[in-house]
Amino acid sequence: MILSIESSCDDSSIAVTETSTKKILYHKKISQEAEHSCYGGVVPELASRLHAVALPKILEETKPWFDKLKAVAVTNQPGLGVTLLEGIAMAKTVAVLQNIPLIPVHHLKGHIYSLFIEKKTLFPLLVLLISGGHTQIIRVKDFEHMEILATSMDDSVGESFDKCAKMMHLGYPGGPLIEALALKGDENRFDLPVPLRNSPLIAFSLSGLKNAVRLTVEKLGGAEKMTEQDEADLSASFQKAVKLHLLQKSKKIFAKEPIRDFAIVGGASANQYLRGAYADLCREFRKTMHVAPLQYCSDNAAMIGRYAIDAYEREQFIDPNEIDIVSTKKQQAGMLL
């Protein structure tokens, strides 16, 4: 069994996974959305304090499996430094006290492995990762080789949803709020720009679109004067522009990549509008689409545990005294995760 810990942002999560069957024996997540909502986004120091309270409570519930643990896994990159530290400190303590190996896990690799929770892996695979911190298309050849084909030049998909929701005073997290409002809106009312539409670059950029939303809010008299229909129409128009941007760049990669299996992962992959758009794109290019179960789209320890099983089989351990937060360089196309 492997104990896995996730604390890269605002979700405190711990799981226990059986190594041989890959079955989840225990999984719990405590979200901090309510505490951060009034700020319109995650406050790192507050998140760290909340992790310090939540993680020990969850860990206490995993005590029945302690004697059977073979390893402990923890996210150590990328993420908020002060929140990663909480999970790492706990993992080091468990590893030392139980005298078991420690497995560091890259958070984005964990998201990819959310596809394989309680399942066998499927490689090779093209993956669109859309979350609060990242927007990337990754070619996953196997466990060892994951190459970034396209990445964001600025704001991620999840971040842009959150910031646009904040501009309209909708609340946090913005993704589900904008998606729900968009169902009642006219996506053609506001002519928002599709980023990099005329650029040959195979990359993502949402800062310009975000600014266009800000200017539209101002033209409507500010968030306070917007009607519910204004909010719905702007949400729908924004979501449509994001979709068109993602699809345009994805098509260029689909056209030259022979890999037949494609997946969407990350918190923003729960968006049903975007899922539907990519289902259509996969049919057009005759690719098979895969998605993680909705409960495993956002940050969770189950995906960290699933990745850790494959790492454990390859004996990718680290001395508990040597693990630390890894400073992640700005990721570019061509780089390996």
UniProtKB/Swiss-Prot annotation:
It comes from the Bacteria. Its main location: cytoplasm. Its EC number is 2.3.1.234. Its cofactor is Fe(2+). GO terms for cellular component: cytoplasm. Pfam families: TsaD. GO terms for biological process: tRNA threonylcarbamoyladenosine modification. The keyword Transferase applies. Keywords: Acyltransferase, Cytoplasm, Iron, Metal-binding, Transferase, tRNA processing. Substrate binds at residues 129-133, 162, 175, 271. It catalyses: L-threonylcarbamoyladenylate + adenosine(37) in tRNA = N(6)-L-threonylcarbamoyladenosine(37) in tRNA + AMP + H(+). It is found in: Cytoplasm. Signal peptide: none annotated. Fe cation binds at residues 107, 111, 299. One of its GO terms (molecular function) is N(6)-L-threonylcarbamoyladenine synthase activity. Binds 1 Fe(2+) ion per subunit. PANTHER family: TRNA N6-ADENOSINE THREONYLCARBAMOYLTRANSFERASE (PTHR11735), TRNA N6-ADENOSINE THREONYLCARBAMOYLTRANSFERASE, MITOCHONDRIAL (PTHR11735:SF6). Belongs to the KAE1 / TsaD family. Required for the formation of a threonylcarbamoyl group on adenosine at position 37 (t(6)A37) in tRNAs that read codons beginning with adenine. Is involved in the transfer of the threonylcarbamoyl moiety of threonylcarbamoyl-AMP (TC-AMP) to the N6 group of A37, together with TsaE and TsaB. TsaD likely plays a direct catalytic role in this reaction. NCBIfam families: gcp_kae1, T6A_TsaD_YgjD. This is tRNA N6-adenosine threonylcarbamoyltransferase.
